[in-house]
């Protein structure tokens, strides 16, 4: 499932991120890539252990915590500490699949990457090229979103970032280990949850239809979740 989530960050929050990142040290982005992906990758990142990355990463995690769409769609068990990248003119990332398992630095644990996320920090008018191109079961999708918006997609997807021909594209990116590893089951649960929300707009929570749908949703989640 590929999902666009608008307004994860407000315009004021995006400006704060941009100001902090302007002052950050940027290094070669290949340091976080696997051996094969590193050969396809040409971009910049701020170091994962930098004060800016830690502060802004915590900010992103708080924004995710208050976003019901992200939590319904990703059903996150663990979220990898958000990273920040930058593509200047001429930079790109050729087609690749994200590493299946990633160690969390300093945490003594690893996560399975089920859901990939890109949170855009520059608007589409600030650069040419730079589309996130995702190949999924419904074909090839080209994504270029407003600043503050985010896209979710299965980490199993082959994806790339087109070469930048003007300007600079900034973003935060991270992975989630979902309580439900199978993308089809996650999509069904998300659609089920959306249907419950719409039903509750028309019927009281005590209505048998609402109670029945809610009960079935939670029983399916109980059946499929891995903790």
From Swiss-Prot:
Which cofactor is essential here? Fe(2+); L-ascorbate
**Domain Fe2OG dioxygenase: where?**
78-178
Provide the GO MF annotations for this entry.
Answer: 2-oxoglutarate-dependent dioxygenase activity; iron ion binding; L-ascorbic acid binding
Which keywords accompany this UniProt record?
Dioxygenase, Iron, Metal-binding, Oxidoreductase, Vitamin C
Q: Which GO terms describe its biological process?
A: DNA damage response; intracellular iron ion homeostasis
Chain sites annotated for binding Fe cation:
96, 98, 159
Q: Which domain of life is it from?
A: Bacteria
Q: What class of enzyme is it?
A: oxidoreductase
UniProt-listed Enzyme Commission number(s) = 1.14.11.-
Binding of 2-oxoglutarate: at which residues? Answer: 169
Q: How is the cofactor bound, as the UniProt entry phrases it?
A: Binds 1 Fe(2+) ion per subunit.
Q: Which Gene3D superfamilies match?
A: q2cbj1_9rhob like domain, Rabenosyn, Rab binding domain
Instruction: Give the signal peptide as a residue range, or say none if absent.
Output: none
Stored InterPro entries: Oxoglu/Fe-dep_dioxygenase_dom (IPR005123), PKHD_C (IPR041097), PKHD_hydroxylase (IPR023550), Pro_4_hyd_alph (IPR006620), Pro_4_hyd_alph_FE2OG_OXY (IPR044862)
SUPFAM superfamilies, alphabetized: Clavaminate synthase-like (SSF51197)
Q: Which PROSITE patterns match?
A: FE2OG_OXY
Q: Show the SMART domains listed in the entry.
A: P4Hc
Q: What is this protein called?
A: PKHD-type hydroxylase GOX0559
Native species of this protein?
Gluconobacter oxydans (strain 621H) (Gluconobacter suboxydans)
């Amino acid at each position: 499932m590929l999902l666009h989530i608008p307004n994860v960050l407000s315009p004021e929050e995006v400006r704060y991120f941009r100001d902090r990142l302007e002052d950050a040290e940027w290094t070669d982005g290949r340091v976080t890539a696997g051996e094969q992906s590193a050969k396809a990758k040409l971009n910049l990142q701020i170091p994962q252990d930098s004060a800016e990355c830690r502060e802004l990463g915590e900010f992103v995690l708080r924004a995710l915590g208050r976003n019901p769409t992200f939590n319904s769609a990703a059903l996150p068990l663990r979220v990898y500490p958000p990273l920040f990248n930058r593509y200047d003119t001429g930079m790109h990332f050729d087609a690749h699949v994200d590493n299946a398992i990633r160690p969390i630095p300093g945490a003594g644990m690893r996560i399975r990457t089920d859901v990939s996320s890109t949170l855009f920090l520059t608007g589409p008018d600030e650069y040419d090229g730079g589309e996130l191109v995702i190949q999924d079961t419904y074909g090839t999708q080209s994504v270029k979103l407003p600043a503050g918006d985010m896209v979710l997609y299965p980490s199993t997807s082959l994806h790339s970032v087109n070469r930048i021909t003007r300007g600079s594209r900034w973003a935060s990116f991270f992975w989630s280990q979902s309580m439900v590893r199978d993308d089809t089951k996650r999509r069904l649960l998300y659609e089920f949850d959306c249907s419950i929300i719409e039903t509750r707009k028309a019927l009281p929570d005590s209505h048998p239809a609402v109670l029945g749908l809610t009960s079935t949703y939670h029983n399916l989640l109980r059946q499929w979740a891995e903790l």
